[in-house]
Amino acid sequence: MRAIRLLAVSGSLRRASTNTAALEALARLAPEGVKVLLYRDLATLPPFNPDDDIEEKPKPEPVETLRALVSASDALVIAAPEYAHGLPGALKNALDWLVASETFAASPLCSSIRRPALSTHRRPCARSFPRWLRA
């Protein structure tokens, strides 16, 4: 039986991020049969522009890499801080690139929202990510 593959994404770009630390702990403590890959290239993604995401146009390499990692994973795990009562911009940018891709629609997504202010984002996220599990 093959291992369950989780792609873990921290919404924080800080070097000493507690969200990244939590995902690193998840990777270390994952039970046998669960493989966790921590995606560390959020800052390399270019700003999302729908004009750049058409079939005839090659995608930026960081976008292709992220989409391939999501496609190869059984689920996506996100840990993110709250910035200005919302999602961090770098994370929102990554989600925009992923939502534009058909491969993301079937991916289960687990996120942890620690602040009540972010709960207002759950409804639109649930529409964009039909398999979103809230922890």
Please identify what each model-predicted range represents:
Residues 1-80, 84-96:
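N-terminal beta1-alpha1-beta2 submodule of the flavodoxin-like/Rossmannoid cofactor-binding fold
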Residues 18, 107-135:
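Short, glycine-/small-residue-rich phosphate/pyrophosphate-handling segment
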Residues 82-83, 100, 114-116:
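Beta-hairpin (beta-strand-turn-beta-strand) motif
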Residues 91-100, 130-135:
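Short, electropositive alpha-helical surface patch
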Residues 101-105:
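Short, conserved loop/helix-junction motifs that constitute active-site signature segments
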